[in-house]
């Protein structure tokens, strides 16, 4: 009894410490965020390189001092402010962006630098259900980003000696693999051994994602199993078992540091350490205890770690294996009409491996499926096959690769021929990932599940587990079936109420950066107007990374209408991925003045997906329930100057007494033509809401056009810190002069307008 009281007391104390830390850290972040835009001269130590592009390198740094020079005659108050900001920033981790044109040399761990910097706090979610960058950085204990210039190296080779040795060894591993393997194979092997995917080929990485093998590229519990297995054989060389176990502990700690101490690595490492310590103390290791201690330690160190998706998947996988592995393995044996294999032999070992691999994979996925659906909107029905095939060589590959790396220290080029075998194994793994990515149902997109569904899923799983493990030792299949049916029926009664027919209008002006995209939901119909995209063909796919996940987060798996105002990439490019992966019933477009490769691509895609194409021009009306679309422009006369922009579809969406005018990227010439077309009936142009043309460019939104439209609300789709000077200050002044309320995606994030008993406007960046 005393033992349980002690354990309970320890748990309560640890929880109190964790809550205290959460409060301290929460206010700590807010203090730092309050200094957004702070500019100064800083001194920092480089911890590691985070990422690299063609234009800049991003480092993780630990800030040490604020070196703003102050003359002797400056006011005391200013000195106090400087000291306070120095105290707030000091000893905290930040990202430092350095443009390559300003500083070409790479910085190593332990380098003390001085730089001019502007602090930028990280963005939170910019769209509903979107990526929360600030939360991601909090899981890494990073407080934001500095834009660095005038970088000067003051001291090299500072920092922890052990860390320098580990980083040197990591660099050595990379150099050995790059020197002895083909490029793609070397980069994959680096990812498998130390979790560094920086240079991994995008197609190979995508194949691993699609085939549900990403966990192999992120160092996880399986890697520690391989390391412990290898170390077990090595420590058998020692006559003293305890000495071997101590060496194993050291190896685990070094491996944790070698792979970057990510959340999932720390979880695996702590549990592995506790297992070895239990053996040292002649105690039985308990998975639940080890897991509880691991999460408590991690939460005490960083309370935000629970929001790390890798950590959630790591713990979820372990919980699934602990709960269901033996159950599934036993059932597989019985289903196949075989008995548990006891005899040695290749055939029996293969059968045993197949059973164990399937049961481990299934049991882990039982728990993590909702996490995958919630965070990635995907499920896979072929994960068993891919993990069975890839897992068969993964363990041997990792151990063999590490052996070669260590042997190369002594024998250097003498063992180069042995790398041929490793290269072939890596080619085989790449082939398996590619083939498995092509399997049917390898990647199924699903809408983001409602919290009710997630709870129901875990309730059913819990009930299933309880039934299987009831004291009578019998599985009451009927009870499981009845309970599951009751839960499903309840959900079916609840959801019609939650998702009943939308009787009001909701306009979601989506933040897609330097582009336009609007979702309108009315009469149980989903209408998407434009899809954003890249103006210069960057690798970032707005459709895949922002728009498609956004629609799934909104619970949308089918679009009734897609409207393309014109075929500039920043309006249509994001639609391609959506069209490829979601049913689109109708596409409303204009062929007038839109001849381009983007137009041809869209037409081909629509025909391939059996999307009904509706070509419109001035005077057309499309009724959608109790709302309708009225096309105002273009007519038969086209503008040849900047044709795509100036011949964009201009239309009004009208619902009851609310109207919104969409103007694409039209410029002054098109606005003047529209004014001439409706000079005898200017009230046709009046609208409650105006989607400002061309992102607020100075070539659009003339005074005469604004006076004719007379909007109460103006929406501007514009990228944060864009290079185009959008929106133009003159446009902003003209909008203000008519008393129009202005909402910009660079300042507001997504803008949601709900039309129900008046207009209610919500800005995503203010909804924190």
Please identify what each model-predicted range represents.
Residues 3-11:
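N-terminal alpha-helical targeting/anchoring segments
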Residues 8, 202-383, 400, 446-500, ...:
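Hydrophobic alpha-helical transmembrane segments in multi-pass membrane proteins
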Residues 12-31, 491-497:
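Transmembrane alpha-helices and immediately adjacent membrane-cytoplasm interface residues
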Residues 19-215, 545-552, 558, 592-594, ...:
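Membrane-interface helix/helix-cap signal primarily in integral membrane proteins
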Residues 28-29, 369-373, 406:
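Juxtamembrane interface at the ends
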Residues 57, 73-81, 102-118, 136, ...:
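Non-globular, low-confidence helical/coil segments that flank catalytic cores
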Residues 139-271, 276, 366, 508, ...:
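Aromatic-rich juxtamembrane segments at the membrane interface
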Residues 162-181, 188, 196, 204, ...:
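Hydrophobic alpha-helical segments of integral membrane proteins
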């Amino acid at each position: 009894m005393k033992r349980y009281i002690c354990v309970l007391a320890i748990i309560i104390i640890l929880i109190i410490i964790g809550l205290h830390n959460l409060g301290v850290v929460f206010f700590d972040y807010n203090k730092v965020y309050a200094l957004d835009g702070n500019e100064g001269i800083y001194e920092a130590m480089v911890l590691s390189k985070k990422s690299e592009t063609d234009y800049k390198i991003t480092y993780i740094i630990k800030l040490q001092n604020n070196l703003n020079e102050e003359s002797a005659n400056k006011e005391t108050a200013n000195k106090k402010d400087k000291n306070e900001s120095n105290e707030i920033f000091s000893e905290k981790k930040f990202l430092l962006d350095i443009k390559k044109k300003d500083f070409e040399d790479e910085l190593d761990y332990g380098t003390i630098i001085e730089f001019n910097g502007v602090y930028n706090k990280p963005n939170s979610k910019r769209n509903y259900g979107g990526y929360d960058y600030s939360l991601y950085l909090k899981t890494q204990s990073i407080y934001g980003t500095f834009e660095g210039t005038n970088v000067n190296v003051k001291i090299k080779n500072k920092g922890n000696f052990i860390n320098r040795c580990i980083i040197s060894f990591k660099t050595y591993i990379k150099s050995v693999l790059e020197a002895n393997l083909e490029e793609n194979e070397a980069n994959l092997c680096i990812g498998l051994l130390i979790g560094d995917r920086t240079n991994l080929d995008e197609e190979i990485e995508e194949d691993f994602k699609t085939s549900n093998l990403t966990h192999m590229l992120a160092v996880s519990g399986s890697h520690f199993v391989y390391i412990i297995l290898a170390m077990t054989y090595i420590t058998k060389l020692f006559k003293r078992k305890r000495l071997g176990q101590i060496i194993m502990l050291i190896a685990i700690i070094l491996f944790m540091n070698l792979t970057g101490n990510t959340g999932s690595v720390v979880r695996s490492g702590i549990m592995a350490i506790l297992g070895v310590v239990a053996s040292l103390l002649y105690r039985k290791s308990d998975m639940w205890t080890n897991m509880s201690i691991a999460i408590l330690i991690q939460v005490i160190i960083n309370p935000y770690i629970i929001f790390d998706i890798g950590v959630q998947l790591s713990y979820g996988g372990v919980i699934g294996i602990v709960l269901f592995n033996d159950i599934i393995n036993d059932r597989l044996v019985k289903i196949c009409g075989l008995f548990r294999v006891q005899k040695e032999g290749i055939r029996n070992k293969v059968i045993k491996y197949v059973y164990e691999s399937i049961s481990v994979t299934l049991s882990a996925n039982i728990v993590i499926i909702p996490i995958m659906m919630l965070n990635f909107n995907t499920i896979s029905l072929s994960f068993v096959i891919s993990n069975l095939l890839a897992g068969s060589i993964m363990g041997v590959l990792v151990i063999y690769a590490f052996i070669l790396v260590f042997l190369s220290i002594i024998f250097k080029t003498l063992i180069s021929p042995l790398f041929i075998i490793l290269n072939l194994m890596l080619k085989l793994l790449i082939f398996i990932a590619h083939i498995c990515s092509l399997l049917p149902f390898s990647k199924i997109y699903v809408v983001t599940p409602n919290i009710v569904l997630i709870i129901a899923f875990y309730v059913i799983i819990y009930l299933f587990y309880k039934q299987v493990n009831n004291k009578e030792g019998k599985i009451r299949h009927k009870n499981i079936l009845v309970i599951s049916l009751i839960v499903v029926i309840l959900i079916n009664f609840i959801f019609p109420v939650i998702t009943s027919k939308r009787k009001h209008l909701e306009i979601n002006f989506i933040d897609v950066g330097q582009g336009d995209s609007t979702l309108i939901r009315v009469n149980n119909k989903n209408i998407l107007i434009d899809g954003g995209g890249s103006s210069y063909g960057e690798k970032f796919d707005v459709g895949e990374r922002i728009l498609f996940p956004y629609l799934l987060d909104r619970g949308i798996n089918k679009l009734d209408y897609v409207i393309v105002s014109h075929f500039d990439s920043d309006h249509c490019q994001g639609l391609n991925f959506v069209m490829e992966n979601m049913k689109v019933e109708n596409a409303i477009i204009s062929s007038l003045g839109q001849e381009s490769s983007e137009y041809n691509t869209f037409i081909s895609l629509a025909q391939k997906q059996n999307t009904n194409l509706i070509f419109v021009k001035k005077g057309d009306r499309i009724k959608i329930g109790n709302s309708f679309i009225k096309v105002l422009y273009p007519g038969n006369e086209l503008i040849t100057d900047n044709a795509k922009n100036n011949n964009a579809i201009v239309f009004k969406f009208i619902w009851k007494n609310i109207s919104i005018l969409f103007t694409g990227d039209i410029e002054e010439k098109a606005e003047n033509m529209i004014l001439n077309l409706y000079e005898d009936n200017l009230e046709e142009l009046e609208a409650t809401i105006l989607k400002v043309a061309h992102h607020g460019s100075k070539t659009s939104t003339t005074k005469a056009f604004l006076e004719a439209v007379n909007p109460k609300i103006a929406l501007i789709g514009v990228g944060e810190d864009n290079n185009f000077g959008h929106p133009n200050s003159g446009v902003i002044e003209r909008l203000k002069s008519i008393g129009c309320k202005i909402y910009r995606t660079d300042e507001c994030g997504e803008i949601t307008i709900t039309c129900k008993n008046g207009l209610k406007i919500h800005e995503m960046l203010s909804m924190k």
